[in-house]
Amino acid sequence: MIPGEIQVAAGDIELNVGRETVSVNVANHGDRPVQVGSHYHFYEVNDALVFDREPSRGFRLDIPAGTAVRFEPGQARTVQLVAYAGKREVYGFQGKVMGALEGKA
């Protein structure tokens, strides 16, 4: 092994297998680019991103950890979201949830 070398198993790694997903059409109505990270609660993204937010409650982008999606001004696209797992509690971001996702609206 070479120092710093990373050895990975052969084959592809499937992400988020069996988790609930939803597709959302999103448009950036702002005058600046908006970048959203892989684990950001999509329901609470920048208000310049216009979309039906309710279906995104409890979901994040279905992309590899540590990556992001950038929305340029005036750009519209469809993104795939995946449900949060574990305790399904959300804290921080814009403070719109601050607790359990289930049983609150």
Swiss-Prot record:
Keywords: Cytoplasm, Hydrolase. Pathway: Nitrogen metabolism; urea degradation; CO(2) and NH(3) from urea (urease route): step 1/1. It is found in: Cytoplasm. Pfam families: Urease_beta. InterPro entries: Urease_beta-like, Urease_betasu_sf, Urease_subunit. It comes from the Bacteria. GO terms for cellular component: urease complex. GO terms for biological process: urea catabolic process. It catalyses: urea + 2 H2O + H(+) = hydrogencarbonate + 2 NH4(+). One of its GO terms (molecular function) is urease activity. Its EC number is 3.5.1.5. NCBIfam families: PRK13203.1, urease_beta. Heterotrimer of UreA (gamma), UreB (beta) and UreC (alpha) subunits. Three heterotrimers associate to form the active enzyme. HAMAP family: Urease_beta. Belongs to the urease beta subunit family. This is Urease subunit beta.
